[in-house]
């Protein structure tokens, strides 16, 4: 039965019972085609029956019984012990009761052949690990059967790396995990289960959702008892006092940091202690990491100067680990991690070479495992040890002895400070050149499970000297100062005995009765609070989890790091005598006590539904791709959609959940289509960036046809912006055009054409058509021919499998040319062909061979698309000489290497087909005049290869050894000669041959049957009408140009006069040419591309949508207009006008979702495409006085900043909330806000005040970072040029460049006052002194200075907007006119 039909039901449970009787714990448990996960435990004599019985009591708890008998009350009250319970364990019955309580199916095969099977419908509890069945094959064993392999990560691992997983102690994340824990408690309490929570029993899903294995405490009782781990300070004291060896202490430190042997990315780390140069010396410096010793301080400082700033990537990389273990690791692992190609000679052969080569630290195997020297690979020699030892065993003993050497012992604490200690802290690591990448890596995708773990926050104590004198107490004093005393005494607070007859004693007795009555519930509540404390204090636990005493000690030591509401809750852990909430009210009590926001409570509830549905699908209990499975997917997607709308600060959860759906073959398409709109509106930019790679991988999938649809692509382009879309998403869409899947190729082609029209000709030429040209070669990568026969037999009948796919790409390019202009052919298509041929000529490669075939298709397309006049201008010098003749010289020269002779022959066939198409197009006379070179080359080559004897038999000609001509097969020569002889006749064909007699054997059989058209074609040239083609019926009839006719140079800007086949004007063609030819964008030629008319008064502000095909304008006539950029029109009216403003519009900006914010004193946020008003906000002040909102500026995708003319504060508006979210005070002194600018998503905000003060603050928290005093009291605009440089523009003063680091100072003054300024990615555009346009690079270097003439723009320029993708400028004037100029 196929996997698709598997569904968990009673019949499957019966089938499973048959399999279990023969299953062994180490075997794979496979039910039909589904692999299940199972684990088995046995009860034996050494099992602690009492401890096991306690764990069962917690699961089968009956203490919460209001009808508790009176005798038990009296026993508790009088302190009489309850009668001892029987230790006999009713094993199978208890498991059956557990299964019934948790709705788990139960199988009992212990009394074979009789079986008891109890099927339960699967009930998913989102915070509990799902179990399909509990089974017994013997009377003393138990088997737990799970569904899909667990996706979760050990929760302790997540907490160890909390610096990345819970950055900066994120209170929202802590609240979310706490809510998970409270929901779990409620789920268990409703089933009367009193679990004692431990972090080791939790797993954390990638979406930060906690799952608890409720049966894990029972299974722990079957494992061999593990020696309790001693506290870290005690272990440190043992090492310092020489009770422990260095090896034992390093093993302990690696253990508590979660490093496990065998894990490639998380293996234990030991130090290299010597360089193996001598037997008793050569010790390394332990106060520096091996990476620093290997790379040097200069390189580490240079790495710190780059982003992200760090010194050490990792102390033990996967490459280093695999190289160390190269002799014992399988070859597949080595090729996966080290190098794909297996080259055993590249691996270090000796220990000294290993030490010199590696920048990584050592591994413990070099101190305890001699087998690591013996190679399991026949082609790799054993690892050689130093000469002063004779065997691997002796080396291990010697190396271990070196590790325990006194020189190492007295300096090991320095190495521990670098690897486990205080030098890992950010501030200390900068001075020690020890800042690790894992601490500064931003926007990491998913939960971190590897990296450094800091155990000590103080310098590590040194080891007791070997010759320590007890009379000298200096060492003990040092140890006390470090906090590692030799003894520790705990003072006990004196207990106050209450008065015997006091009400307090009576109350305490009542509490004692109640506490003991519900002791298991009380312990469960305490353990839940201990887990919460470990979440809050994860960075300070030093790897010691589930230790109640250590947790309480850390709460006391780091109380200042604990949020106040959690601090009050943790008071219950120190005073257990105080009133605890009732067990049924615990979750509500903690939620209220912690003041968990309602948003997080609602989000957790909705997200829990999504997790439950996802778990249900992944348990393999429902057939995938079935109707039921599709229904569950729809519900899961809808739950995730609601969660995204509620997520606010819990983006990590929804991003991880969305990634899981993207990686799910069944759910990915529906998820993307349904969630993309809400993701665009809700998530931050950093969260969206995490989704880029999964979405690109999904688009690249051959089955994802729907994701190439234009509706989805529109959402993606809006979501990520045009720059990111063109750079990252467009290439895989273009690649889809070359897919062998016809549906995928057709949809991709249509979408690309839609994008080409949407973005316009300039962007199309720079990004779209250039990529389409490159992808054509991929159609021919295999050089497979149509049919079973793969060897070409006829020159003009070679058809490749990629021809059909390439024809679709060809039609796409043709449509682009038809839509815009032949300029695309003359400045892009043909130069691309020439460039590719030149690359092959310089260095032939297998990768470029398919490109030669694509070149022929591009040339053929160009010939069909160009007019007669255009073709003849580019024919001889360009198409014939630089393409066809150049390719033939390569093909007919044997010194150029091809992957095979078959490939070379196929390419020769294709170039002959192209040459034939050209001759059909231009006719015989034009062929003789302009296209004779390829024919002369071919026939001269043929005559040098072959010769004829007196009997007209064709033989190979004897050639000198230095002759490098390729030996063209005889059948190819016959085909070529026969084809052209039939069409032109032998006399005309012989004009291309130096030795016409060579043709006689090839045409002797066909000359007698020459057709009449051939005889006409071979008439003397005088019989032709002047400039006439002749009687050719195929192709256009062209006029022949004389040899003296001028041919336009290919380097001209696209032929401004060759635009008759498209809709573009000559000026637009010039812009396309400049863009393709890579002409510097820093130019202004005073060319007007388009006029926009509609405003009646001054243009205040211009803003463009990221794709630059639409823009908006704000005017003093109280309107905001939406415009489209249409290259085919010279004058355009507005698309839509927003008319709800009642005063002149001051400012305007466009949000990431293309909604528009404009202000006339009141903030209006509206959607121009749905023509709806989204929000309208006035400036409401706490003082009661309003004011006019004068400026608005984007902070990030969803947040706007606004300033008012009557206040000195900045307000933030969140488009997701639809209102003000906070108000930031920008200066402690007087002064009103005048201008504002934002950089780096709110990290830096600069606000200019009326008193000349410039305030620089962080918009995320409102912190003022700097205040600078300038002379600008009437500032009209402020613009960030770089991280530390600003342009301040004043209405009366000249603009100034202001440097803010280290102290604010003026770098440079501009020549004139700046009336308008706009910043792009790499340039600053300004309008100065009314009519002067100046463009500066970000460094401040002047690039353009020109004057806008009155005949170019009526009125005075008042607003400017550069369009960098289109290499043009929008300029607005005081008369309301707008011009698109270049």
UniProtKB/Swiss-Prot annotation:
The keyword Isomerase does not apply. Pfam families: Beach, WD40. PROSITE patterns: WD_REPEATS_2 (PS50082), WD_REPEATS_REGION (PS50294). GO terms for biological process: early endosome to late endosome transport; endosomal transport; organelle fusion; positive regulation of early endosome to late endosome transport. WD repeats lie at residues 1094-1133, 1140-1176. InterPro entries: BEACH_dom, BEACH_dom_sf, WD40/YVTN_repeat-like_dom_sf, WD40_repeat_dom_sf, WD40_rpt. Disruption phenotype: Coelomocytes contain larger early and late endosomes enriched with PtdIns3P. Delayed conversion of early endosomes to late endosomes with early endosomes retaining PtdInsP3 for a longer duration of time which may possibly be due to a delay in either the turnover or transport of PtdIns3P out of the endosome. This leads to continuous fusion of early endosomes which continues until rab-5 is displaced and rab-7 is recruited. Double knockout with sorf-1 results in a similar phenotype as the individual single sorf-2 knockout. Coiled coil: none annotated. The keyword Repeat applies. It comes from the Eukaryota. Keywords: Cytoplasm, Endosome, Repeat, WD repeat. Residues 229-463 form the BEACH domain. One of its GO terms (molecular function) is phosphatidylinositol 3-kinase inhibitor activity. It is found in: Early endosome; Late endosome; Cytoplasm. Together with sorf-1 negatively regulates the levels of phosphatidylinositol 3-phosphate (PtdIns3P) to enable the conversion of early endosomes to late endosomes. Binds to sorf-1 and the sorf-1-sorf-2 complex likely acts through bec-1, a non-catalytic subunit of phosphatidylinositol 3-kinase (PI3K), to suppress PI3K activity, thereby negatively regulating endosomal PtdIns3P levels. Interacts with sorf-1; the interaction is direct. Interacts with bec-1. This is Suppressor of organelle fusion 2.
């Amino acid at each position: 039965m196929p996997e698709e039909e598997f569904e968990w039901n009673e019949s499957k449970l019966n089938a499973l019972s048959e399999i279990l009787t023969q299953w062994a714990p180490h075997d794979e448990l496979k039910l039909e085609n589904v692999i299940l996960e199972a684990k088995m435990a046995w009860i034996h004599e050494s099992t602690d029956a009492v401890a096991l019985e306690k764990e069962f009591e917690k699961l089968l708890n009956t203490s919460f019984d209001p009808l508790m008998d009176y005798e038990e009350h009296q026993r508790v009250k009088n302190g009489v012990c309850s009668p001892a319970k029987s230790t006999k364990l009713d094993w199978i019955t208890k498991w059956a009761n557990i299964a019934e309580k948790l709705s788990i199916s139960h199988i009992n095969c212990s009394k074979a052949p009789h079986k008891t099977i109890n099927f339960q419908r699967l009930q998913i509890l989102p915070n509990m690990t799902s179990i399909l069945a509990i089974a017994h094959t013997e009377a003393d064993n138990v088997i737990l059967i799970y569904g899909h392999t667990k996706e979760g990560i050990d929760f302790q691992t997540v907490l160890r790396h909390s610096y990345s997983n819970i950055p900066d102690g994120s209170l929202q994340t802590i609240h979310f995990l706490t809510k998970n824990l409270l929901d779990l408690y409620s789920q268990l309490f409703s089933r009367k289960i009193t679990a004692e929570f431990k972090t080791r029993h939790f797993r954390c899903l990638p979406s930060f959702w906690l799952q608890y294995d409720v049966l894990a405490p029972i299974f722990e009782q079957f494992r061999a008892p593990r020696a309790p781990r001693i506290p870290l300070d005690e272990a440190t004291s043992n090492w310092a006092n020489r009770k422990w060896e260095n090896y034992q202490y390093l093993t302990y430190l690696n253990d508590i940091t979660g490093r496990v042997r065998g894990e490639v990315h998380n293996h234990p780390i030991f130090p290299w202690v010597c360089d193996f140069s001598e037997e008793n010396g050569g010790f390394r410096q332990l106060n520096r990491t091996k990476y620093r010793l290997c790379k040097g301080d200069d390189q580490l400082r240079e790495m710190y100067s780059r982003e992200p700033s760090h010194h050490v990537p990792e102390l033990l990389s996967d490459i280093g680990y695999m190289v160390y273990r190269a002799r014992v690791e399988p070859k597949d692992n080595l090729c996966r991690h080290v190098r794909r190609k297996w080259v055993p000679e590249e691996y270090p052969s000796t220990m000294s070479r290993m030490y010199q080569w590696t920048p990584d630290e050592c591994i413990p195997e070099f101190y305890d495992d001699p087998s690591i020297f013996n190679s399991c690979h026949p082609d790799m020699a054993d690892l050689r040890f130093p000469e002063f030892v004779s065997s691997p065993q002796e080396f291990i003993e010697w190396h271990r002895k070196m590790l325990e050497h006194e020189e190492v012992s007295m300096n090991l604490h320095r190495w521990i400070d670098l690897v486990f200690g205080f030098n890992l802290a950010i501030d200390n690591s900068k001075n020690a050149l020890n800042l690790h990448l894992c601490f500064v890596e931003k926007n990491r995708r998913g939960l971190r499970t590897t990296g450094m773990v800091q155990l000590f926050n103080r310098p590590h104590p040194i080891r007791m000297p070997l010759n320590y004198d007890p009379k000298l107490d200096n060492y003990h004093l040092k140890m006390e100062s470090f906090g590692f005393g030799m003894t520790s005494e705990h003072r006990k607070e004196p207990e106050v005995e209450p008065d015997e007859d006091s009400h307090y004693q009576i109350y305490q007795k009542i509490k004692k009765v109640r506490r003991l009555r519900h002791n298991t519930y009380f312990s469960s509540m305490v353990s839940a609070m201990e887990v919460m404390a470990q979440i809050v204090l994860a960075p300070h636990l030093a790897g010691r989890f589930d230790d109640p005493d250590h947790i309480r000690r850390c709460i006391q030591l780091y109380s200042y790091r604990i949020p106040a509401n959690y601090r009050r809750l943790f008071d219950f852990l120190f005073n257990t005598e105080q009133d605890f909430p009732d067990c049924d009210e615990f979750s509500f009590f903690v939620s209220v006590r912690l003041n968990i926001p309602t948003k997080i409570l609602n989000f957790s509830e909705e997200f829990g539904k999504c997790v439950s549905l996802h778990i249900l699908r992944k348990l393999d209990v429902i057939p995938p791709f079935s109707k039921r499975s599709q229904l569950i997917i729809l519900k899961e997607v809808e739950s995730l959609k609601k969660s995204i709308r509620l997520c606010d600060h819990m983006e990590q959860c929804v991003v991880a959940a969305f990634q899981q759906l993207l990686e799910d073959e069944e759910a990915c398409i529906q998820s993307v289509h349904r969630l993309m709109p809400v993701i665009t509106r809700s998530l931050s930019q950093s969260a969206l960036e995490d989704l880029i790679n999964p979405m690109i991988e999904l688009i690249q999938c051959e089955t994802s046809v729907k994701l190439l649809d234009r509706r989805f692509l529109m959402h993606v382009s809006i979501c990520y912006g045009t720059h990111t879309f063109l750079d990252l998403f467009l290439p895989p869409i273009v690649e889809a055009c070359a897919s062998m899947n016809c549906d995928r190729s057709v949809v991709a082609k249509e979408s690309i054409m839609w994008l080409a029209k949407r973005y316009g000709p300039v962007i199309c030429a720079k990004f779209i058509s250039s990529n389409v040209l490159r992808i054509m070669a991929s159609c021919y990568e295999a050089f497979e021919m149509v049919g079973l026969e793969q060897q070409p037999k006829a020159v003009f009948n070679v058809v490749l499998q990629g021809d059909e796919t390439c024809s679709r790409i060809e039609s796409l390019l043709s449509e682009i040319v038809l839509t815009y202009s032949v300029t695309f052919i003359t400045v892009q298509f043909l130069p691309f062909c020439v460039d590719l041929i030149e690359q092959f000529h310089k260095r032939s490669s297998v990768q470029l061979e398919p490109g030669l075939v694509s070149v022929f298709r591009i040339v053929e397309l160009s010939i069909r698309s160009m007019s007669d006049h255009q073709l003849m201008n580019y024919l001889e010098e360009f198409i014939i000489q630089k393409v066809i003749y150049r390719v033939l010289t390569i093909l007919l020269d044997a010194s150029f290497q091809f992957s095979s002779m078959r490939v070379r022959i196929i390419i020769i066939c294709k170039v002959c087909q192209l040459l034939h198409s050209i001759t059909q197009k231009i006719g015989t006379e034009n062929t003789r005049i302009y296209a004779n070179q390829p024919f002369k080359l071919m026939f001269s080559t043929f005559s040098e290869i072959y010769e004829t004897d007196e009997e007209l038999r064709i033989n190979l000609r004897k050639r000198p050894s230095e002759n490098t001509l390729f030996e063209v097969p005889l059948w190819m020569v016959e085909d070529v000669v026969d084809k052209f002889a039939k069409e032109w006749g032998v006399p005309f064909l012989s004009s291309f041959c130096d030795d016409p007699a060579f043709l006689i054997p090839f045409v002797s059989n066909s000359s007698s049957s020459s057709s009449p058209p051939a005889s006409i074609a071979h008439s003397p040239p005088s019989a032709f009408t002047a400039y006439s083609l002749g009687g050719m019926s195929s192709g256009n009839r062209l006029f022949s140009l004389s040899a003296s006719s001028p041919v336009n140079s290919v380097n001209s800007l696209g032929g401004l006069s060759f635009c008759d086949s498209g809709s573009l004007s000559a000026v637009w063609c010039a812009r396309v040419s400049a863009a393709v030819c890579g002409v510097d964008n820093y130019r202004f030629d005073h060319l007007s591309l388009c006029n926009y008319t509609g405003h009646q008064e001054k243009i205040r502000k211009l803003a463009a949508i990221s794709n630059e095909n639409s823009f908006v304008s704000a005017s003093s006539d109280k309107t905001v207009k939406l415009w489209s950029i249409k290259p085919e029109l010279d004058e355009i009216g507005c698309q839509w006008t927003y008319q709800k403003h009642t005063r002149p519009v001051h400012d305007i900006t466009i949000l990431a979702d293309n909604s528009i914010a404009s202000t006339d004193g009141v903030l209006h946020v509206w959607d121009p495409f749905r023509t709806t008003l989204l929000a309208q906000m006035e400036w409401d002040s706490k003082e009661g006085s309003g004011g006019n909102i004068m400026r608005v500026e984007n902070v990030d995708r969803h947040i706007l900043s606004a300033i008012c003319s009557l206040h000195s504060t900045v307000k933030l508006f969140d488009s997701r909330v639809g209102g003000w979210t906070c108000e930031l005070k920008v200066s402690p002194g007087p002064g009103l806000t005048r201008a504002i600018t934002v950089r780096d998503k709110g990290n830096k905000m600069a606000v200019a005040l009326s008193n000349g003060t410039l305030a620089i603050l962080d918009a995320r928290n409102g912190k003022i970072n700097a205040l600078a005093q300038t002379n600008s009291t009437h500032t009209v605009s402020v613009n960030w040029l770089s991280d530390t440089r600003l342009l301040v523009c004043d209405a009366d003063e000249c603009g100034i460049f202001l440097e803010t680091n280290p102290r604010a100072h003026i770098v440079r003054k501009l020549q004139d006052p700046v009336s308008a300024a706009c910043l792009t990615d790499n340039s600053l555009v300004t309008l100065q002194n009314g009519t002067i346009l100046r463009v500066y690079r970000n460094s401040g270097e002047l690039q353009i200075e020109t004057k806008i003439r009155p005949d170019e723009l009526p009125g005075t320029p008042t607003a400017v907007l550069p369009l960098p993708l289109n290499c043009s400028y929008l300029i607005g004037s005081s008369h309301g006119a707008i011009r698109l100029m270049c």
